[in-house]
Amino acid sequence: MPREIKDIKDFLLKARRKDAKSVKIKKNPENVKFKVRCSRFLYTLVITDKEKAEKLKQSLPPGLQVKEVK
């Protein structure tokens, strides 16, 4: 089941959870989507600012598997 998250801090808390498996980063010309797969839900965060997206990518937990999709 998908869920959309509006807050960056809330997304980082979800990404640091024990059941978070992987993060997919989808880049479009107008926005960047971060999708974190947890055991029950797929949480999605949409960011329109490219600089914020790069900072968020750097602050993801190191043990999490990150896949970039063009």
UniProtKB/Swiss-Prot annotation:
It comes from the Eukaryota. Coiled coil: none annotated. InterPro entries: Ribosomal_eL38 (IPR002675), Ribosomal_eL38_sf (IPR038464). Keywords: Ribonucleoprotein, Ribosomal protein. PANTHER family: 60S RIBOSOMAL PROTEIN L38, LARGE RIBOSOMAL SUBUNIT PROTEIN EL38. Belongs to the eukaryotic ribosomal protein eL38 family. This is Large ribosomal subunit protein eL38. The lineage of its organism: Eukaryota, Metazoa, Ecdysozoa, Arthropoda, Hexapoda. The gene is RpL38.
